[in-house]
Amino acid sequence: MADPRSKELNMLDGPILPRILQFTLPLAATGMLQLLFNAADVIVVGKFSGSIALAAVGATSTLVNLIVNTFIGISVGVNILVARRIGCHDADGVSRASHCAVALSALLGLLMMAIGLLFSRPMLEWMETPADILEKSTLYLKLYFLGVPFTLIYNFGAAILRAYGDTRRPLIYLTVSGVVNALLNLFFVIVCKIDVAGVAIATVISQIISVFLVMRCLLRFDGWAKISLRQIRLYRSEAVQMMQIGLPAGLQSMLFNISNVMVQSAVNSFGADVVAANTASGNIGNFTYTAQNSVYHAAITFTSQNLGARRYDRIDRIFWGSCAAVCIIGVPLSLLSTVFGPQLLSIYIARSDPAYDAIIQNGVIRNYYVIAPYILCGLMDAMCGMVRGLGRAWLPMLVSLTGACLLRIVWIWTLFRWTHTLEMLYISYPISWIVTAAAHAVCYFVIWKKLRAKLEQAAPQTEQA
């Protein structure tokens, strides 16, 4: 019997690009909306508490991404496993994977919360966070990590919905939680005069709301992934498969963020004004990155479902459709962010702030070198998603480790040390994207050519048996 929710989005038939856009646009809107509400933290703090509080929140961003995205990357394993079992019409397998995902996310969330609470200050000190913002950054980070278990449960639940092609409801859930987050930001910062701690508490409360909504959806789900509280447990086989598929994605994210932590440390060497500028520009650029990154998830999900359903003729079309989707989404956003850079940067800091001019000037530098060529990053991620969707979990991680992370670290230790300028630091991003995207593309074409020949050769033998 077919899953009653399997037609949420038909990934196995019809034109590729429109279906990819149908999948990615709500997911992109979800991510951008989440960023919009996260940016509200930064904007409210910058406008009403000054550049020191802005820098304090911003100095934690790469560290938060390092730890949180490492574990969230494992949700890729949930997405691939559930999507492939949907394609194979394995009802029991979808149910077991879904229940295991909820249990695994809670366990990993508690582990990550403990790590964050214990090592927040030592990690910030290792990053050479300026002394005038260290205390506030530590407070923000510890409060943020209290909500991390809810973040993971939400992301694993959303991964189950994405496996069905449902990217609409996560958008609704984040809209609700995001509005609450923005209102609480204003209440805590303006009314209660709690700056850094206030925005952190607001974030945790909004995360709790998003978890409630996604779990409520899964408990009432009318498909194979319907959750029953009594069946939530770690199924050994499913947990191992999720970790085998998702752990490399998590480690890849960690490696990227380790290099970004080193970049943040290099940015810290220029002082609090440049840290604030980097924070504002980074928030602007994250909108483009997140929108493009939705294509990465589409590439994984579409490839996994079609591979499970033996629709091998569609895989190459998914590759080119994913690249086209990146261009359609990424180019306009990058252009808008670059052309209107000064105006967008001015949102994050009060004009009366003594550091206003320096923050705008340094933020524009980052916009030109990082945001303008962001499409390269989007293409790199889409190609990585194709390789991962083919079932190759570790290779994309190794390619990213070599092409992006190590290259960026070596760049900081050599060229940046010799020419200590923001321009020399930021140009390491587009160069690393070009190298890594080219390597992922070569891996995809070589792997798919061999895998397709093997699968098509095995298919007649299976039919005869």
What does each model-identified segment do?
Residues 75, 144-162, 170-178, 199-212, ...:
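Short runs within selected transmembrane alpha-helices of multi-pass transporters and secretion channels
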Residues 54-114, 151-170, 277-341, 377-399:
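Small-residue-rich hydrophobic transmembrane alpha-helices
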Residues 22-41, 143, 177, 206-210, ...:
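Transmembrane helical elements of multi-pass membrane transporters/channels
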Residues 32, 36-55, 124-131, 187-194, ...:
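Helix-terminus/linker motif at the lipid-water interface of multi-pass membrane proteins
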Residues 49-62, 137, 141, 200, ...:
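Small-residue hotspots at the loop-to-helix junctions and early N-terminal turns
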Residues 13, 17-36, 40, 63-70, ...:
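Residue-level signal for short hydrophobic patches within transmembrane helices
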Residues 66-69, 181-185, 211-215, 287-290, ...:
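Hydrophobic transmembrane alpha-helices of multi-pass small-molecule transporters
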Residues 1-24, 82-147, 191-247, 303-373, ...:
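Short alpha-helical transmembrane segments in multi-pass integral membrane proteins
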